[in-house]
Amino acid sequence: MRLCYLFLSFILFSIPVQAADYVAIQHAENQSLKLLSLSDSLDLALKANPDIAVAIREREAIEGVKVQAATRPNPFVSTSIQDTRSATRQIYFQLNQEIELGNKRSARIEAADAFYSKADAELATKQAEIHANVVLAFYELLVAQERVTLAKSSVEVAESALDAAAKRVKAGKSSPVEQTKSNVATATAKIELVQATTQLNNSRKRLSALWGDNAPSFEYAVGDVASIPEISSISALQTRIDNAPSVKLAKQEINARDAVTKIERSKATPNITLSAGVVNNQELGGLNQALLGLSIPIPVFDRNQGNVQEAVSRKFKAEDELIALKNKIQTNLLTQYERLSAARQASLSLQNDILPNAQSAFDAANRGFSLGKFNFLDVLDAQRTLYQAKSQYINALLEAHQSIAEIERALGEVVDHQITKP
C-alpha cells in the first residue's frame, strides 16, 4: 500500500508546468503532430488577419484620393443661338475654363497626403492591436494546454486513489466513507478535465481566428509559459507614449483636420471662369467676331463660413482627443505594469515557497497514511491543495503574460518575447 501511494505522489509531482515539456512529450509520441510557435502565430496573423486587410484596402483607397486631389477642373464648351431667322442669326461658340483661386488645389493635395498618412497610422495601430491579440491568445492557449495536462494527471491520481480505497474497504481496513469520498474526488477531477478540454478547444479557435482560420490546423502550441519576458522600467515605458501607434494615429487625425480646415478656408475665395470663343453674325454677312469673357461669383452671402467653423471645431476636438488618449494610456500603463509586477511576484512565491510546501505536505500525508497515522481524507486534502497551488501558479503566469500583451497593445511592440526574466 505504501508503494501505491508513493506512486500516486510521483504522478502528481511529475506534472509539468512548462508548455515546452508538454509539447516535447506529445511530440515524442507522434512525430506527425503540427506544432505552432508564437513567431509562427504572429506571421500568420499579420499576413492574413481580416482587419489588417481592411486597413490596407483603406490605404489603397486613399491613393485614389491623392490622384483625384491633384486634378484641375475640366474645360467646357458652350453654344447658343440668338434669333432663329437666318438673315439676322447670331451663333455663339465658347470655350470656358474655371481657374481655381485661394490655393484650393494645393490644399486638396495636402489634405490627401494627410489622410494617406492617417491611413498608414491606422494600419500600424491595427497591426499593434493584432500583435497584442495574438500574444494574448497564444499564452492563453499555452495555459489551457497546461490545465488539460494538470487535469489529466489529477484524474489519474484520483482513479488510482479510488482503486486503493476500494481495496482497503474490501479488506476491512477502511470505512466505506473513504471510498465514497474518493468517488466524489474522482468525479470532480473528471469534470475539471472536461472543462479544461473545452477551454483548450476554445483557445485554439480564438488563436486561429486571428488569421481567418475557423478550423485550427495545428495540434499544439510550442512555448514556455513559465518564462515571463523581460520588460523595461515604467519610466522608460512612459517615454514611449508619444510613439505609441494610437497616439501617432491621433496626431495624424489632427493633421488631417488641419488640412480640411485649409480646404474650407480656401473655398471662401471664389473661382473665376475665363471664356474665349467666336460669334458668327449673319447680319454682318456671316462675319466671325472674337468673344472673350470673365465670370466671378460675388461672395456676399455664402463665404463658406459655416464649413470653416465646423472644420476648426473638429480640429480642436481632435486635439482634445489626443490629450484624453495620452491620459488613458498613462493610466492603463501604470495599471498593467503593477499587475505584471504582482503576477511576477506571485509566480515566484508559488514556485519557490508554496509549491514545495504543498509537495512536502502531500508526501507527508502519503507516508502517514501508509503508516496508519493519517486517514484518507488527509491524503485527499493534500492532493487538492497541491492541485490548487499548481492552478494558482499557472494563473499567475497567465496574468503576467496578459499584462505584457496589454502593454504592447498600448505602446506597440516593446517586448522581445525571446528574452525572459525569472
Language-model features: locations:
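Periplasmic alpha-helical coiled-coil/stalk elements that build and connect Gram-negative outer-membrane
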Residues: 5, 21, 126-243, 336-339, ...
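Acidic, low-complexity, intrinsically disordered peripheral segments
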Residues: 6, 20-25, 30, 392-422
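Sec/Tat signal peptide C-region and signal peptidase I cleavage site
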Residues: 15-19
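Amphipathic alpha-helical coiled-coil segments
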Residues: 54-69, 126, 130-151, 160-162, ...
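Short flexible linkers and secondary-structure junctions
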Residues: 20-140, 148, 158, 173-179, ...
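A small-residue-enriched
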Residues: 20-22, 43-101, 213, 238-320, ...
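Short, charged, amphipathic alpha-helical segments
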Residues: 110-113, 176-185, 376-383
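Bacterial N-terminal signal peptides
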Residues: 5-14
